[in-house]
Amino acid sequence: MAALQKLPHCRKLFLLCFLLATLWEARAGQIRYSVREEIDRGSFVGNIAKDLGLEPLALAEQGVRIVSRGRSQLFALNPRSGSLVTANRIDREELCAQSAPCLLNFNILLEDKLTIYSVEVEITDINDNAPRFGVEELELKISETTTPGFRIPLKNAHDADVGENALQKYALNPNDHFSLDVRSGADGNKYPELVLERALDREEEAVHHLVLVASDGGDPVLSGTSRICVKVLDANDNAPVFTQPEYRISIPENTPVGTRILTVTATDADEGYYAQVVYFLEKSPGETSEVFELKSTSGELTIIKDLDYEDATFHEIDIEAQDGPGLLTRAKVIVTVLDVNDNAPEFYMTSATSSVSEDSLPGTIIGLFNVHDRDSGQNAFTTCSLPENLPFKLEKSVDNYYRLVTTRALDREQFSFYNITLTAKDGGNPSLSTDAHILLQVADINDNAPAFSRTSYSTYIPENNPRGASVFSVTAHDPDSNDNAHVTYSFVEDTVQGAPLSSYISINSDTGVLYALRSFDYEQLRDLQVWVIARDSGNPPLSSNVSLSLFVLDQNDNPPEILYPAFPTDGSTGVELAPRSAEPGYLVTKVVAVDRDSGQNAWLSYHLLKASEPGLFSVGLHTGEVRTARALLDRDALKQSLVVAVQDHGQPPLSATVTLTVAVADRIPDILADLGSLEPSAKPNDSDLTLYLVVAVAAVSCVFLAFVIVLLAHRLRRWHKSRLLQASGGSLTGMQSSHFVGVDGVRAFLQTYSHEVSLTADSRKSHLIFPQPNYADTLISQESCEKKDFLSAPQSLLEEEREETFSQQAPPNTDWRFSQAQRPGTSGSQNGDDTGTWPNNQFDTEMLQAMILASASEAADGSSTLGGGAGTMGLSARYGPQFTLQHVPDYRQNVYIPGSNATLTNAAGKRDGKAPAGGNGNKKKSGKKEKK
C-alpha cells in the first residue's frame, strides 16, 4: 500500500527530471541574448563561459572563437572573462530594416573538440530615426466646385524604426477649410488624407498653405514635416480611377533589364483636358524606384535594374494616376521575385592545417569548413565531395559543416603534398558547383634507408697509380627529405696483408669518392674487397651497404729477366759451340727469359740485334732459339759474337739484352789447332823472319799462360760455388724470388748445366769440365743422335752427390702433370721458325707461363711427367717453341775430354747411340746430322 502511495511522487519526479533535461538540451543547443542597437563598442552582451558551463580559463585553453558568415564581425569574445561583447557599431535598421524582431545568428567554435554552439542575439530598436516624407513639398489642385467631405490622399511618411519608435500619428496645422484624417492599411501603415471641410472659393483664396507633421512614439518624440500647397481650380469633379486597386505579378529574378512586366490603366469620367491621365511612381525611400520605371503616358511598368532574389524576395510599388487638373488616385503593385539557381555554393573555411606528418593515423582531422548557398529551396540544397583517389574523406556535421579526415596512412615518398579539390554542388537545374583547393604538405619522417643503384660495384685501377688519385665514386639515394636524406659514406674497416684497409684507401664522407692512399703494385696486391656504408642523418639514422671490388691492372713496369745463359759472376763469358758441319737450322743455343708482369706485358719476343757475321745466325721470334741461318764456311771466323734482345709487348715495351759467344768448330781441340795453324807465310828474302817468329811465339806463349792461369782460377771458383749451390739446395743466390710459379726451379735447372772451359799447357788439348748436377738423371737431347758417357769420375762420389741432391729436391707438383690425352705432341719436332702464334688472351698466357715454369721445375728435380718427348715439356706445337729446353744437354756432345777417348753421355750411361734399359724407345739413325 505504501508503494502505491509513493508511485505518484515518483512519476512527478520523473516528469520534473525530463523537463529539466529538455530545457538543458535546448539551452545547450542554442544560446540567446538581447542587446540594444547603437551601443558602444565593447559593451557586454552575455557570459558565454557561464552559459556553456565552462570556466573562463578552460574556455581559453580550448581555443574558442566566433564563426560568422557573410557579414562583418559584430561581436567578439573576451578569452579571459568568457564574455560576449560588441565588436562594431550595430545598426538594427541596416541589418533587419522593418523586420521585427531583429535576430542575428552566429556560431561559436571550440577548436579543441571541434564543437559548435549556435548563438542568437536579438537587436532591440532605439528611437534613432525620425519620420521622413518622400517629398518635402506637395502641390495639390482642387476645383472650387469640390463639395465638402472630399478626400485627397497625401504622401505618407516613413520611419525606419519599429514598434513604439515607428510612425505613430500625423497632424495638420489649423485652418478653416481642411482637416486631416488618418486611415490604417492592411499592412499596418498609416495613410493620411486631406478632408475638405468647407467649400472653396477661388476668388476668395486661390492658394492654401498647409503643414503636415508626422510623429513617432519614441522618447523623445521625433517628427518630420511636409509642406502642402493647395491650389483652387475650376470645376473638375472626377478623379482618375485604376482598373483594380492592387496589382500582383510574379517574375523570375533573371528577367532581363528593359522587360515590360505590367501595364496599369486608370480612367477619368471627365472629358477633355480634365480626362487626360498621367502615371507616376510614388517616390519613397528604398530601391524600388531604382529597380522599376512607370511610363507616364502608357502606364507600362518596366525593369531598369537587375533583380536579385537574395536581396529582396518581393517589391511593393505605389503608383499614382493624375488627370489634367491635378486630381489623382493611388494603386499598389506587388511584384514577387521568383528564385532561380544563380548562386553557386560558397565555402567558408573554419579551421585547416597546412601540414600533416606521414605517420599520422587514419582518421586524423585535416580541416573543418562550412558550405552555404544563397539560393532557396532545392537550389540551396548542397552536397560536398572530393576525388575518390585521395586518402581523405568528408564527414558531415551539423548546419552543413564538414570535417576533412584521413582514411589511410600517408607516404611522403610517393606524394610529398596533396592539392585537395573540394567540390560543392547545389540541387538546382542546372546544378551549380564551386571548387575549393587545400594544399596539404606531408611532413617527412626517416622511414627510408639510403639505397645504392646496384647490389655490387667493381672498378679497375692501374698499378703504380699516384697517391691520392680518385679510384671510384659510389652514390646512394635516400627518398626522404632534408636531414633524413643527407647521406654520409664510410667503409667497413678490414685487414689487407696485415695492414688496415684505411691505409690503402679513403672515402669522402659527403661525395662518396674513394681515393687511393698508396701506389698499388699488381705483383703484390691484385684486388681489394671493400664494403661501403651509406648512412642518412635521420633520428634514428638508417644505413645500407654495398660491396665494391677494386681490381689492380698490370702495367709494364718489369723488364724481361734472362734466365739462360746465366753468366758467371766473375765477368767471364760462356762459349757455345757450332760445328762447321752444321746445316742451316742447326740449334746452337737458346735464350730463356721470363717477365714478372702478366698478360700482354709478359709476352716476349726475341730479336738478333748485332752479329759479328750478319746472316750467319737467326733467333726465333717466340722461342729464343739461336740457329744457323746458312751452312758454315771455311771463311767464317772461329769466334762469333751475337747480341740478342728480349722485348715484351707492353706499352711502352721494355727489353733486356744478352751477348753470346759462339765458337765455330767441331771440337775444342779443333779450335786450338786452327788457332795454332794461323801462322804467317814465309816470304823470301825476309831477313827478319826468325826474329819475328821468336817474338810471336813468346808473346803467344805468355798470353796463353796467363789465360790458362785465369781459367784455372775461374774453374776453382766455379767448383767452389757449385759446392755451395749443392749445399743450399741448388737455388740461385742474389736473385729475388719470382712471383711466377716454378721460376726458382728453372734457375736451379739451368744452374745444373753451367760449364767451364779450361786449357792445359798443351794448347792443342782442352778440358771442358761440368760441375756435378743436382741430380743424377738429365734430360735426353732430342737433337743428339749419339749417346755419350759422363766424364770419368769416381762412382762413389756421384752416388753420394745424388743422394744429397735428392734429399734437397722438392717433390714434383702433380697439379701441373698432364694426362696422355692432354699431350698433343712434342714441340721438339717443330721447326724453329719465327711464325709462332701468340696466346689468345691473358689467361692463356699466364697458364702457359705456369706450365713452362712448373715443367722446368720438374725437369730440375728429375721427376717430370709431362711426356711428349724429352725436353719438350709436353706442350703442343702451338706453345712448344716458347720455352723448350732440349738444347741444353745437346752441348755435351760437342765436348772433347783431353787424354781420353770418352765423350759425354746422359745420366743413364747411354753411349754410341745405344739406348739404355727402360728408355723411351726413340732411336736416332746413326750417321745423320742433328736436326730439329
Curated annotation (Swiss-Prot):
Region described as Disordered: spans on this chain: 798-841, 902-932
InterPro entries: Cadherin-like_dom, Cadherin-like_sf, Cadherin_C, Cadherin_CBD, Cadherin_CS, Cadherin_N, Protocadherin/Cadherin-CA
Side Extracellular, residues: 29-692
Superkingdom of the source species: Eukaryota
Main location group: membrane
Topology of this chain in the membrane: Single-pass type I membrane protein
Biased composition (Basic residues): 922-932
Keywords in alphabetical order: Calcium, Cell adhesion, Cell membrane, Glycoprotein, Membrane, Repeat, Signal, Transmembrane, Transmembrane helix
Region forming the signal peptide: 1-28
Stated name of the protein: Protocadherin gamma-A2
Protein source organism: Pan troglodytes
Gene name in the database record: PCDHGA2
